[in-house]
Amino acid sequence: IPAKAQQTPDARKILDETASLFTSKGGVKATFKADNFTEGNLQGSATGTMCIQGNKFQMTTPDMITWYNGETQWSYMKANDEVNVSVPTPEEQQSMNPYTFVNLYKEGYHYQLKEKTLRGKSCYEITLTARNKQKSPHTIILDINKDNHNLMCIRMQQRKKGQWTRISIQQLHTGQSFAATDFEFNPKDYPQAEIIDLR
């Protein structure tokens, strides 16, 4: 099916349905695989889990745990027992939390809608292209399951051409309950960690 013109009403409706999974049904827990590419060459990969509630998240990979409570971010590096504390910019949030698209798509992007098959499932492929060429991410491609509107894959191109991130969602569970403390670093759990405050 050929791509439809820019602000496709169907694409917006599909995006609204997918976004509602993250905003109206409690928290979300996902397992994922993230790959970073430069000029088509794989630069690095990571697998992990992510817990999301509104604009808060906790992400765990083999090397790092990140907590974000909507304002402050803590990144714990397992290898050197170190915690970086920061207040991320919106652009930094987008690179850490793929679900920022929940608000991102609503303004500043054109849409294109196609249909495809991914992992044996029928999907919508929606390409978001920034109207402002200086905006980052410049291009976002979302693969959305046609049956339940779950997000299956996100590809993001940063403003610098040739740099892509692909996040494949392996499992997605909606309607999860999380405590506020799930999104904050607890120093009692890491008594030996060196805390580096970058705020």
Outline where the language-model segments fall.
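N-terminal leader/targeting segments and the immediate start of mature chains
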Residues: 2-42, 53-56, 189, 194-199
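Extracytoplasmic
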Residues: 25-27, 45-47, 54, 68, ...
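Short, exposed beta-strand/loop patches in secreted or surface proteins that constitute
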Residues: 21, 48-51, 65-66, 111-117
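Flexible, surface-exposed loop/linker segments and immediately adjacent secondary-structure boundaries
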Residues: 88-121
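A generic structural motif
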Residues: 33-37, 60, 76, 129-131, ...
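Gly/Pro-enriched, hydrophobic low-complexity segments
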Residues: 109-198
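An acidic-aromatic
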Residues: 47-96, 161-166
